[in-house]
């Protein structure tokens, strides 16, 4: 009796153990990501041919205590390798695990290879060569818990490969995981549907099961082909038996399988895969997204008075592995997909059983279905849940609105602000700003896009609860506004005093043009925490435009230069835009070009604003400065705190401000206190105009910013 080991993805061990027992294996014992078993050679062959869950089947050659590299070498050297392959065969050694003596897997593999070669050489045999890509014999070794385990691979290419793939979607489901989903769903051959079938893996594997087709029947190469102990006669008899079973199974197979996908290119690959697998006649493919999902089974005719149409309707099994996204920004569109799937199931699949795999419990919750069972599976290293549901016969598509209080508030805000924005001539505004404490986020509208920015929740609120509320908000926002889920951008930021550090989120570029009181401005909704336009300063920018005619304008800490655009359009004779960021200064120039504001009268300076201010000596009639609340950038020589340093800032600006000039000073420091006495001593006076610069969509947030007009003491302050 030989000892074997079958590897598998985590979560499949129990299924694999039962399968091996059914094949005739003895002393079956589960471990993490694998199953030990014993049997005659035929059992090893059957496992290679028939296992739907295994990744590899290996023959255990030796297991021994190992403390250092010498133990590994000697243990490998004692194995009678010449009984397993000849010197003319090529070999590869795969090694996993480390200890203080074997600190990397390459070294472990090298010691075993040396032991093999030395044994062949000492016995006067030709030494085998190494071929890492396509060896005749693959030796696999694992080091763990002080023991080395050396095995010979019988599988060849990994057993999840069925050799029917002609092409795949972006993230193909491995075949053994697909089989685990089918097994855990409880499918018993009834009609099956995959509404997001991708390359068709689930449906093709289901067809193999229904037709009693061995999963490895199509492969041409196994790891034992060049093994000296290979029994070709035994193997051929097992293959012939499998072929007969497949032929008979296909003849009597009447299973109904249905697959849908929104992508016609992926669907074409699914059809090609099914054809290559020999099961195309069992699967009906249709291009459709989940919003178009329909029950593929016909509604039967019934005799009035006997049974209802719903009771007579044929039911089936729906199994799917919807996309679950690993990046936060993908979630809004995926929420919409899962919500639509749940609605479709309640609307048209009454009585069906449903099994959905996802790495996101939050997305599964968007189905609004109660699971009967739940299983833990792994898609590669990603932990997933497989949830089984039963759609009630009397279920209906309409459900209680998600986050109803939030949805009602958003609906109210939308009704008020949409009309106001249209009248004002703006197409981006704040729609919601943590109006309800339990829904702690800001939602900004940019034309037909929504940007949802989550604020950090208090530490005493569980992260899972916070996450679920955020996803509920996104779901409700999509429904209330009618926005496409793909045009909802989700961001996470902490509520801080002042502006955030401008953190880059991605390398991609997504620019779009928006309108603001006649100004055309570029915004980027995806790539930064901020979009390039601070909406709360909209009235301030408009005011600057109205004040700018014929004036020399300076914009310090200019960000993307939107205030400069308004000043330029307002007729400023010249503008100077200063910012430390090369990225934002280029953005400012793009904004100016978009409004045909070009020429030498418009200057752009990349510099540390505080250092530039201390050295500048030009005069300006209108100055706008909106510094950060706090900054300690690597490019700055020292830190800046707006509360601590604003008086020094004003003293520098006084030197640049023309005798009858106006300085507009704004910041986002909550509870900022202007040093009026210090200003007076410096020969300046200030007027608080915050209430005049706070736009309608920020009326609820009294501390979003504060704004001041500052002039020389002898000049009248402008309102």
Swiss-Prot record:
Main location: cytoplasm
SUPFAM superfamilies in alphabetical order: S-adenosyl-L-methionine-dependent methyltransferases
EC identifiers of the protein: 2.1.1.173, 2.1.1.264
Keyword line: Cytoplasm, Methyltransferase, RNA-binding, rRNA processing, S-adenosyl-L-methionine, Transferase
Gene3D superfamilies associated with the record: 3.30.2130.30, RNA methyltransferase domain (HRMD) like, Vaccinia Virus protein VP39
Cell compartments where the protein resides: Cytoplasm
Protein name as annotated: Ribosomal RNA large subunit methyltransferase K/L
Primary role: Specifically methylates the guanine in position 2445 (m2G2445) and the guanine in position 2069 (m7G2069) of 23S rRNA.
Source organism of the structure: Aeromonas salmonicida (strain A449)
PROSITE patterns listed in its UniProt record: THUMP (PS51165), UPF0020 (PS01261)
Domain of life: Bacteria
GO MF entry, a single one: 23S rRNA (guanine(2445)-N(2))-methyltransferase activity
